[in-house]
Amino acid sequence: METSSPWPPRPSPSAGLSLEARLGVDTRLWAKVLFTALYSLIFAFGTAGNALSVHVVLKARAGRPGRLRYHVLSLALSALLLLLVSMPMELYNFVWSHYPWVFGDLGCRGYYFVRELCAYATVLSVASLSAERCLAVCQPLRARRLLTPRRTRRLLSLVWVASLGLALPMAVIMGQKHEVESADGEPEPASRVCTVLVSRATLQVFIQVNVLVSFALPLALTAFLNGITVNHLMALYSQVPSASAQVSSIPSRLELLSEEGLLGFITWRKTLSLGVQASLVRHKDASQIRSLQHSAQVLRAIVAVYVICWLPYHARRLMYCYIPDDGWTNELYDFYHYFYMVTNTLFYVSSAVTPILYNAVSSSFRKLFLESLGSLCGEQHSLVPLPQEAPESTTSTYSFRLWGSPRNPSLGEIQV
């Protein structure tokens, strides 16, 4: 947890010192300039990238149902809300002007509530997406029946409702108060800060639960599910015949996020097990291996991004909570002050890089994203729809796309 002055107040401030000295805040000008530049870059790229992602989801594929579009929309809206609401307030009242807090008690509670809401919504959305992908890869036939756009909308609605409930306590334990009193016992207006209002014991319990629910458990679940997904896909791919086998081809691009592609792959396996000539299967080659490796790397990158960006943030919160008041030396105060700004910067970076992850996951999304970007930059390029699916035939190839719905054989065609 933190205040608009990230340094805990000194036990016995001297009345002869300036207010900033009495409250323990001394941010160097170089640090203010540096973090302002970093915040500005994150804000510019994050808002532009996520806003364009929302535009791509809502406009480029309007009228076409799809589940992944809802996950992308949920993550992009969460990132936009965090960047637009929290970052400007923090830059002003946490980096440049620590005292007094200028946004009022409601602004203080709202700032922390929005930040917690977006954190919960992001990590739970990523976990739900990983769960859907795991089911789609490991049980493609069942996933085709169970995973529908309507159920995905309900799941993400539940994610946001749960995030609202989990973030509400933050609006209770945080608030505005005056840290310093004048000689006549009246609160000094210039010492108004946004800080913790509850006891240390209550704060410790809250932070423990918060770190567990908003970081450790969802991230562990995401890593576990992604690990199962990668291992299962590797096992499937290992069953592809070598170049000497008398079969023609497997799909040339196997995207990890396509259960339709996995369904086609399962169909091929069943056909092959019967000794039937698999005319839709091509030999394993280097490009297919690179495609599989790319898909696995994307899933690992999603986990790595959130570990790198969020672990220091939560470690710093635990540090603030568990170091006793008499344990804060001048050196520790100084370290925490700048560590605070570094961890919050990383926290916002996680919101800015989500469009990069979308583009890494899907070449189709990347194409639409770049076309939208080009049209907004004045280039004479319209959003070209993805190629229509080829007519059904025994010689057609499968298309593996984030948004795609390639034709798959019916259950009757794959029964053994």
Swiss-Prot record:
It is a multi-pass membrane protein. Residues 56-64, 132-154, 238-297, 359-416 are cytoplasmic. A lipid is attached at residue 377 (S-palmitoyl cysteine). GO terms for molecular function: G protein-coupled neurotensin receptor activity; identical protein binding; protein-containing complex binding. GO terms for cellular component: cell surface; dendritic shaft; membrane; perikaryon; plasma membrane; trans-Golgi network. It holds the Pfam family 7tm_1. The modification Phosphoserine is found at residue 410. Keywords: Cell membrane, Disulfide bond, G-protein coupled receptor, Lipoprotein, Membrane, Palmitate, Phosphoprotein, Receptor, Transducer, Transmembrane, Transmembrane helix. InterPro entries: GPCR_Rhodpsn, GPCR_Rhodpsn_7TM, NT2_rcpt, NT_rcpt. It is found in: Cell membrane. Disulfide bonds join 108-194. The keyword Transcription regulation does not apply. Belongs to the G-protein coupled receptor 1 family. Neurotensin receptor subfamily. NTSR2 sub-subfamily. PANTHER family: G-PROTEIN COUPLED RECEPTOR, NEUROTENSIN RECEPTOR TYPE 2. Receptor for the tridecapeptide neurotensin. It is associated with G proteins that activate a phosphatidylinositol-calcium second messenger system. This is Neurotensin receptor type 2. It comes from Rattus norvegicus (Rat). The lineage of its organism: Eukaryota, Metazoa, Chordata, Craniata, Vertebrata. The gene is Ntsr2.
